[in-house]
Amino acid sequence: NDSSVSRLFFNSRIEAISSGKRRVTAWIENNNFLDGFDPRGNDLTKSNEAGVDLLQTAFTGLDIKNRFTLKSHNTRSSISRLRDRSMSGWWNDIQFQLRFNRSSDVNIGLMIGAESGIQQNNEFSVNACGIKIVNKILYKDTGRFQTEISFVTAKENDDSSFIPPEAVNGYPIGNSFRSNTTLHYFVSRSISMVFSLNTIDDSRYNNFITFQGEVRAHF
């Protein structure tokens, strides 16, 4: 426990890429994060991830994307043992991208995953599955509109009332609905506006809505 260190982050990543008609990317990533802002002590988080990305053109106008990930997570705290947690699991996200023309496409995705581990000295095991739809529209050279909607159901198998926030890609027990809408509009070559609207409705956040607007100038 070094009280003189407030925050320390270390990341390493190795990638291997195969290009062609079928593009494959494999990676291994390691993250170590020390959070010492709390005067009571430090939290040390270690996470490891290995995965494969696959991009395949089925035929003109249809691409298939698949990401499979294996991951592990471990948090140890000198503040309280109740903050300690460890878990491992997997997540798979497959998307079918339909391109209608150069300015519009739709992604329809299926997500499934599982995670198990220990939190507060209790074991947990959770399965999750859901769908995701992403729509992108380009308006000439002046704007871009994108909407993403996801619905995921997570089920806990060991009667735990909650799971760690890192489990199954951050989805809590029960039904989760999330949406993200972004509008990027270029007023001129040097000025642009970005608006984003996010919504979350699940067991952690009840009808949570955030809105953000930006005006960007490039000189």
Residue ranges: model-predicted function:
Residues 1-219:
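Exposed, low-structure sequence patches enriched in small/polar residues
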